[in-house]
């Protein structure tokens, strides 16, 4: 059974989730809501993308709806999630990708319109967070609102799980070298809460905060309080990289650690955790479906208990694919797929 999904918020993640769904045989997007984009503009934004290229399919506007590859996608422009008629569209699940309704209470408004479950495509202060390949099997059908966590947590957590399961992480620090995003400025502008964050994204490396490392403790409870981190926003349009430095209890050579990650990437974490010994750079991974691609050549170890590991991720495409994978998984548990 195909999982019927609605998207609220047709920004970067909303549109990339839609594009991913076209390639995902188990998901059908039946409705989109965005109060700030009318249907013709939505069709244009879906068709043309500066980062991921032109949409490989047919997009038309039919009245107030979109027709994508011959299938009707209902389009609404409601500001209040409670007013979106999800039940009329057939959308059982909703991807909440506005970045606004990220708490359980706010996201639950979608249920008033007939949706049964909401997946927030961002970290949440109170909704349970899931990372595919790490803790997705803890999902229970009585959960109505859940979070797919962040793109960085989706990169970090699978790698941390492999290392912790094999060698036991004592403590660690993470830095994500992160491509700029829509929250940043094209030219210097006001940013009262984060002065450096207001500087132009295309000219600067900007130190910033991130909760991604601490969030790993929510999806891997044994690591709660053992990891923290920061971000460096850099002048690249897409694809980011995690630098994880950890002390491990059970000593291992760097070659042994590489082998452990390689085995996991070919086994239980296949499709989620990747492994490469190629001399890759950011653009080589644009459009990569995986959550985390371990760079075997980029890491180093000081000794058998202190190691730096490097793993790449497409912070748009790979993350959006995991949103859909999570939807398909919970639909199976719910008996709807």
Swiss-Prot record:
Q: Which UniProt keywords apply?
A: Cytoplasm, Glycolysis, NAD, Oxidoreductase
**Matches recorded under Pfam families:** Gp_dh_C, Gp_dh_N
InterPro entries of this UniProt entry? GlycerAld/Erythrose_P_DH, GlycerAld_3-P_DH_AS, GlycerAld_3-P_DH_cat, GlycerAld_3-P_DH_NAD(P)-bd, Glyceraldehyde-3-P_DH_1, NAD(P)-bd_dom_sf
Q: Where is this site: Activates thiol group during catalysis?
A: 178
- Where is the protein localized? Cytoplasm
Q: Which GO terms describe its molecular function?
A: glyceraldehyde-3-phosphate dehydrogenase (NAD+) (phosphorylating) activity; NAD binding; NADP binding
GO cellular component terms, A-Z:
cytosol
Q: Which domain of life is it from?
A: Eukaryota
Instruction: Give the chief site where it resides.
Output: cytoplasm
Query: What EC number is given for this enzyme?
Result: 1.2.1.12
| UniProt catalytic activity | D-glyceraldehyde 3-phosphate + phosphate + NAD(+) = (2R)-3-phospho-glyceroyl phosphate + NADH + H(+)
Q: In which pathway does it act?
A: Carbohydrate degradation; glycolysis; pyruvate from D-glyceraldehyde 3-phosphate: step 1/5
> Where, in this chain's numbering, is NAD(+) bound?
12-13, 34, 79, 315
The record's listing under SMART domains reads: Gp_dh_N (SM00846)
The positions flagged as active site in the entry are 151
Annotated CDD domains: GAPDH_I_C, GAPDH_I_N
Q: Which residues bind D-glyceraldehyde 3-phosphate?
A: 150-152, 181, 210-211, 233
Q: Which family does it belong to?
A: Belongs to the glyceraldehyde-3-phosphate dehydrogenase family.
PANTHER family per the record?
Answer: GLYCERALDEHYDE 3-PHOSPHATE DEHYDROGENASE, GLYCERALDEHYDE-3-PHOSPHATE DEHYDROGENASE-RELATED
Designated name of the protein: Glyceraldehyde-3-phosphate dehydrogenase
């Amino acid at each position: 059974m195909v999982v019927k999904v609605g998207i609220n918020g047709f920004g970067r993640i909303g549109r990339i989730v839609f594009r991913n769904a076209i390639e995902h045989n188990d998901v059908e997007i039946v409705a989109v809501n965005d109060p700030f984009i009318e249907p013709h503009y939505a069709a244009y934004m879906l068709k043309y993308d500066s980062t991921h290229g032109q949409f490989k399919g047919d997009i038309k506007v039919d009245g107030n709806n979109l027709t994508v590859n011959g299938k009707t996608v209902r389009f609404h422009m409601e500001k209040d999630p409670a007013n979106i008629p999800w039940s009329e569209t057939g959308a059982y699940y909703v991807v909440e990708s506005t970045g606004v309704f990220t708490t359980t209470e706010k996201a639950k408004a979608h249920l008033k319109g007939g949706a049964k479950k909401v997946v927030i495509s961002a970290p949440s202060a109170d909704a349970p967070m899931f990372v595919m390949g790490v803790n997705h099997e803890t999902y229970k059908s009585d959960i109505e609102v859940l979070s797919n966590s962040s793109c960085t947590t989706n990169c970090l957590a699978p790698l941390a799980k492999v290392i912790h399961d094999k060698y036991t992480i004592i403590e660690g620090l993470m830095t994500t070298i992160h491509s700029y995003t829509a929250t940043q400025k094209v030219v210097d502008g006001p940013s009262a809460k984060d002065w450096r964050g207001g500087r132009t994204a295309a000219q600067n490396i900007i130190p910033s905060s991130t909760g991604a490392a601490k969030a790993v403790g929510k999806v891997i409870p044994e690591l709660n309080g053992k990891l923290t981190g920061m971000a460096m926003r850099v002048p690249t349009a897409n694809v980011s990289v995690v630098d994880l430095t950890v002390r491990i209890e059970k000593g291992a050579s760097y070659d042994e650690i590489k082998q452990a990650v390689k085995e996991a990437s070919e086994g239980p974490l296949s499709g989620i955790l990747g492994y490469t010994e190629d001399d890759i750079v950011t653009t080589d991974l644009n459009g990569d479906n995986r959550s985390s691609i371990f760079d075997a050549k980029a890491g180093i170890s000081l000794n058998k208990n202190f190691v730096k590991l490097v793993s790449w991720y497409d912070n748009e495409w790979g993350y959006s694919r995991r949103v859909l994978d999570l939807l398909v998984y919970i639909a199976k548990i719910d008996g709807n797929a």
